[in-house]
């Protein structure tokens, strides 16, 4: 058996670099749909397949195809689309991108935010594809465990200026990739509260499903506030 890995290195002018230093309060957080599992979480998936005794050749009605075909759906690539958006809207419009890989949406998005910034993400703004709910049910995994591991239908996130958000949404959808507004960027007030959610210090222990995620993957940057309930396809 062999493990095969590939990597690519890009070069960009310093004046065109995106990242936390460009993100500001009021920026809009836009999701781009994933095509499926995106090559992440397959250790969990394999354990679920084994646990439920599923055959990869079996037809799954909720997928409309076999289990194997669903699990092996090719990963959507966003390279050309992301480059085109920067070319069209510039670094004044596109402030940061976050590729949602292992660790889930919040862990990856928080790393492209500046310290002190909080991106509010509403879970109810999209429908989680059926394959993720199949994994959740088959593995008896909580939604917290799922959102800390898999992309749940969001493959790429763009943090953009509010002034161009509607145009960016249209451009992504016109390129054939479903896109929607996840939320926006804000920051805690001087009293340590986030408008509509209360004290930051209380959010990590919130029992209503509100979670504040920060300091992930060894990076001390911004934070992501998850709220709302998932809709399942």
Predicted regions: what they are:
Residues 23-71:
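Acidic, glycine-rich loop-and-beta core segments that form the ion-binding/anion-interacting portion
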Residues 21, 37, 52, 113-115, ...:
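Amphipathic, positively biased hydrophobic alpha-helical segments used for protein targeting
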């Amino acid at each position: 058996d062999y493990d095969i890995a590939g990597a690519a290195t890009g070069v960009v002018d310093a004046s065109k670099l995106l990242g936390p230093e460009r993100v500001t309060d009021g920026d809009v957080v836009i999701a781009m749909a994933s095509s499926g599992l995106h090559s992440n979480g397959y250790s969990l998936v394999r354990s679920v397949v084994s646990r439920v005794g599923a055959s990869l050749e079996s037809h799954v009605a909720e997928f409309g195809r076999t289990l194997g075909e669903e699990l092996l759906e090719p990963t959507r690539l966003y390279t050309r689309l992301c480059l085109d958006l920067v070319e069209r809207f510039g670094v004044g419009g596109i402030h940061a991108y976050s590729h949602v890989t292992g660790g889930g949406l919040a862990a990856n998005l928080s790393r492209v935010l500046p310290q002190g910034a909080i991106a509010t993400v509403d879970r109810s703004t999209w429908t989680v594809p059926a394959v993720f709910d199949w994994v959740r049910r088959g593995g008896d995994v909580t939604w917290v465990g799922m959102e800390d591991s898999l992309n749940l239908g969001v493959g790429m996130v763009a943090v953009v200026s509010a002034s161009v958000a509607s145009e960016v949404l249209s451009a992504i959808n016109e390129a054939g990739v479903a896109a929607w507004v996840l939320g926006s960027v804000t920051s805690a007030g001087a009293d340590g509260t986030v408008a509509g959610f209360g004290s930051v210090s209380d959010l990590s222990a919130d029992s209503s499903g509100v979670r504040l995620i920060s300091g992930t993957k060894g990076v001390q940057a911004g934070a992501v506030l998850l709220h709302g309930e998932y809709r399942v396809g």
